[in-house]
């Protein structure tokens, strides 16, 4: 009787150890955030056409952002990197 209880406790301990260790053994590889991401490249002409097509009147009327906030956001964009990446 004592052997049976000891063997069941040992079996339970082995099962717990294996079930706890399996996520550590078979974990998906961790990647850097932007290592394998391909960025979509756009030329400056496409960027300017997109900005011209924005209806700032509707944006101001809705009240989600003021025009000053929108312009500040556009000024903070790094256009040098975009210009270098967009050449075809």
Swiss-Prot record:
Single Gene Ontology BP annotation: adenylate cyclase-modulating G protein-coupled receptor signaling pathway
Coiled-coil features, chain-numbered ranges: none
Highest taxon above the source species: Eukaryota
Record bears the keyword Signal: yes
Disruption phenotype annotation: Conditional knockdown in AVB, PVP, and SIAV neurons reduces exploratory roaming behavior.
Residues passing through the membrane, by range: none
Protein's recorded name: Pigment dispersing factor homolog pdf-1
């Amino acid at each position: 009787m004592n052997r049976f209880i000891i063997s069941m406790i040992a079996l339970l301990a082995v099962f717990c150890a294996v079930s706890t260790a399996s996520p550590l053994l078979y974990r998906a590889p961790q990647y850097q955030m932007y290592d394998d991401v391909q960025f979509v490249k756009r030329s400056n002409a496409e960027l300017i056409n997109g900005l011209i097509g924005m209806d700032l009147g509707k944006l101001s009327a809705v009240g989600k952002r003021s025009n000053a906030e929108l312009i500040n956001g556009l000024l903070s964009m790094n256009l040098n990197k975009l210009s270098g990446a967009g050449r075809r």
